[in-house]
């Protein structure tokens, strides 16, 4: 829609609504020049807008021009812009259809509608559809108004893009958490002569703790608990990798020591600096009435029927500390069917409400000993309740994971 016959002073205009722009808002702080695309078919209106931009923008900017929708599309295919100043009525497109097409082609740009007085209602509709603002041509179309509008539009759009990015990240984290939750075992009732109960409560959306139950080729039950240092997506990814390595190697005939030695070598190749993994792996053989374990900086506790406690821990360091470390499988001759194995990460033993007094391994083990005649899931509940009560109203700062393994004499 050409307006070249109009006098500059007669170009219709309007002011920004106070609710959408306020002089009290801080100016946009950007180190790069603002890239602007001016889409206007009237040479007179285009000239007036350029004069207003030159006088109204305090910072540097680059300006691209187009007199039709197709020309604007051509510009957007070659350059990235921060703001589009858009006349909705062009020779090859009219009304909201113009906005929709430009918005699709420039999804990351702020669009400001430059409206004539006869189509202000359409401009308002465009704002409802996602345009950052609109200006009605006329006497109030001033350099100050246009400069302020451009700055505020870029600022609001930047916030909008950040919110979209954060929402995307949040969705990815939720998806990762859902996948991570599915990795925890759900086969606790499938092992003869053994009652199993395990749980992981992450401090953040994606935790670095894990536990697993694996049946090996010889029929033995392999129980694993691990704790990757740190929190967040990095440790969570390392947790998934650690679990995958252990599961893959458990399908072989390697000993526990050989499995963990190999896992350590594989993880050391991928381990980020300052990350490490504490790990405890136990193997139960009901047919041979045997218990063995391999420890990488992580203890386990064997609770006897009479309440005596044996701490199971080797001198090997956590995984990722020394890629050449040789881990050893240790037998437990004191083991008898009917004994109980308690495994937990330091998120439980280091529960605290003031960062001065910590729950400690001793109190956790005492809780297990006290409830040793209860079902495994009841013992597990009491351990988590103990940690939560000790933590009080303080924020949980570390992942909490525990596994209780109760063995039963054959036939029970």
Placement of each model-derived feature along the sequence:
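Short amphipathic alpha-helix used as the core "switch/output" element in two-component signaling
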Residues: 55, 74, 96-108, 125
């Amino acid at each position: 829609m050409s307006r070249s016959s109009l006098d500059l002073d007669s170009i219709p205009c309007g002011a920004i609504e106070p609710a959408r722009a306020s002089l009290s808002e801080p100016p946009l702080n950007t180190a790069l020049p603002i890239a602007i695309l001016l889409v206007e078919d009237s040479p007179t209106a285009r000239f007036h807008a350029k004069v207003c931009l030159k006088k109204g923008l305090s910072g540097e900017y680059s300006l691209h021009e187009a007199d039709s929708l197709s020309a604007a599309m051509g510009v957007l295919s070659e350059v990235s812009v921060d703001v589009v100043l858009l006349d909705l009525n062009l020779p090859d497109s009219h009304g909201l259809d113009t906005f929709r097409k430009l918005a699709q082609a420039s999804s990351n740009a702020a669009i400001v509608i430059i409206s004539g007085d006869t189509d202000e209602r359409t401009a308002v509709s465009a704002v409802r559809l996602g345009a950052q603002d609109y200006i009605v041509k006329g006497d109030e179309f001033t350099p100050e108004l246009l400069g302020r509008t451009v700055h505020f539009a870029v600022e609001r759009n930047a916030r909008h893009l950040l919110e979209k990015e954060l929402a995307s990240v949040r969705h990815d984290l939720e998806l990762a958490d859902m996948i991570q939750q599915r990795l925890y075992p759900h086969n606790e009732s499938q092992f003869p002569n053994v009652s199993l109960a395990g749980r992981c409560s992450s401090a953040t959306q994606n935790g670095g703790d894990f536990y697993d139950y694996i049946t090996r080729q010889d029929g033995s039950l392999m129980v694993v608990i691990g704790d990757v240092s740190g929190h967040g997506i990095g440790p969570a990814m390392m947790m998934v990798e650690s679990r995958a390595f252990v599961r893959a190697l458990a399908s072989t005939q390697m000993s526990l020591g050989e499995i963990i030695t190999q896992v350590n070598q594989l993880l050391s190749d991928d381990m980020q600096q300052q990350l490490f993994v504490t790990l405890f792996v136990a193997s139960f053989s009901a047919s041979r009435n045997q218990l063995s374990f391999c420890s990488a900086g992580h203890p386990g506790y064997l609770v006897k029927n009479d309440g005596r406690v044996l701490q199971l821990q080797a001198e090997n360091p956590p995984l990722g500390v020394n890629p050449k470390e040789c881990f050893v499988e240790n037998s437990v001759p004191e083991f008898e069917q009917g004994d109980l194995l308690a495994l937990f990460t330091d998120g439980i033993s280091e529960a605290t409400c003031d960062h001065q007094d910590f729950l400690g391994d001793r109190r956790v083990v005492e809780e297990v000993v006290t409830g040793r005649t209860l079902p495994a899931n009841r013992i597990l509940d009491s351990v988590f309740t103990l940690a939560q009560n000790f933590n009080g109203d303080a924020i949980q700062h570390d992942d909490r994971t525990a596994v209780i393994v109760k063995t039963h004499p054959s036939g029970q």
